[in-house]
């Protein structure tokens, strides 16, 4: 006996057999993304600074300062010397101030200015001479001079004033001598600027 199994035809196509096993539903995959810890570059601590930001002086530290002072009431016939170092009484902030706090110093520049206070009818001049080793007691040359009726200015750098090496604070570095050939009336004043360096604090 022949058994005929009927198959259902829909729209001219055979209907596929229903699969007895259902397709397994894929399990959801949970991805946990961990945040990457950012690595901070260590800060470089500046030399000479502590945690509070204050400057910590290191051994042998120094300082640079500029001083301006004047020598007033110069007569047309005045003469004298300005000694730069502990003998500089015209600038106590330098001689009795900074020099007391360090063991060594050097003056790297000096600017000598003449401020005229004489009338145009006066005559004469004030000669000056640089003594880089403090050996002269009086003016030996009158080549360099300021006329008393007009202002003048002269600058000396370190190589001229014995300022390339350190000096003990107990010794003077250099000297400027001056002498006028005018009358006894007031001729003007000197305005002096010095640039200094200090080394090895006490």
From Swiss-Prot:
Q: Where is this region: Disordered?
A: 1-64
Compartments where located: Virion
* Alphabetized Pfam families for the sequence: Luteo_coat
* The protein's name in its UniProt record: Major capsid protein
- Compositional bias per record (Low complexity), positions renumbered to this chain: 25-36, 50-60
Q: Which family does it belong to?
A: Belongs to the luteoviruses capsid protein family.
The free-text domain note is:
The N-terminus like those of many plant virus capsid proteins is highly basic. These regions may be involved in protein-RNA interaction.
The entry's function note states: Major capsid protein that self-assembles to form an icosahedral capsid with a T=3 symmetry, about 23 nm in diameter, and consisting of 180 capsid proteins monomers. Most of the 180 monomers are the major capsid protein, but a small percentage contain the minor capsid protein, which has a long C-terminal extension.
Nucleus recorded as keyword:
no
Ordered alphabetically, the record's keywords are:
Capsid protein, T=3 icosahedral capsid protein, Virion
Tree of life domain? Viruses
Q: Quick check: keyword Protein biosynthesis in the entry?
A: no
């Amino acid at each position: 006996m022949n058994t005929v199994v009927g198959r259902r035809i829909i729209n001219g196509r055979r209907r596929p057999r229903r699969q007895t096993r259902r397709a397994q539903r894929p399990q959801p995959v949970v991805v946990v993304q961990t945040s990457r810890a950012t690595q901070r570059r260590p800060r470089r601590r500046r030399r000479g600074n502590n945690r509070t930001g204050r400057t910590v002086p290191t051994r042998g530290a120094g300082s640079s300062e500029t001083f301006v002072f004047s020598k007033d009431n110069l007569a047309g016939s005045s003469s004298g010397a300005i000694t730069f170092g502990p003998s500089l009484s015209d600038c106590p902030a330098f001689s009795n101030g900074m020099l007391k706090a360090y063991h060594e110093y050097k003056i790297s520049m000096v600017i000598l200015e003449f401020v005229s206070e004489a009338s145009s009818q006066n005559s004469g001049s004030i000669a000056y001479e640089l003594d880089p080793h403090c050996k002269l007691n009086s003016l030996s040359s009158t080549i360099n001079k300021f006329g008393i009726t007009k202002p003048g200015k002269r600058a000396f750098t370190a190589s001229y004033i014995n300022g390339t090496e350190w000096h003990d604070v107990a010794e003077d570095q250099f000297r400027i001598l001056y002498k006028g050939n005018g009358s006894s009336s007031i001729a003007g004043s000197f305005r002096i600027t010095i640039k200094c360096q200090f080394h090895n604090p006490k």
